[in-house]
Amino acid sequence: MNYTVDLKPRAIKDLKHLQKHDASRIADVLERLQTDLTGDVKKLTNFTLEYRLRVGQFRVLFEIENETRIIVYRVVHRREAYR
C-alpha cells in the first residue's frame, strides 16, 4: 500500500535542528515509509491514532489518516519523545 507522507511545520523545524547525517537518515526512512510500514513501528498505547517509528536515538511520531496518508508531528530524541 502506498502512503503520502506529510510533515507538520513542527516536524520540519525538528529536522532542521538535527545534524545533517541524522536528518538525512530520518528522511531516508520516511521515504521508505511511503511504500510500507515495516521497521520498528509501534502504536502508542495511551494515544488512539498515534504511532512511533524508531530511527536510532530518534523517534518519529506520526498518525495514519484514512489508510493513505501519514502525518508526521514530531521528530525528537528518545529522551524527549514521550513527555
Language model segments and positions:
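A short, surface-exposed loop/turn module that caps and links secondary-structure elements
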Residues: 29-53
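Enriched for short, Lys/Arg-rich terminal
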Residues: 2-5, 9, 13-24, 38, ...
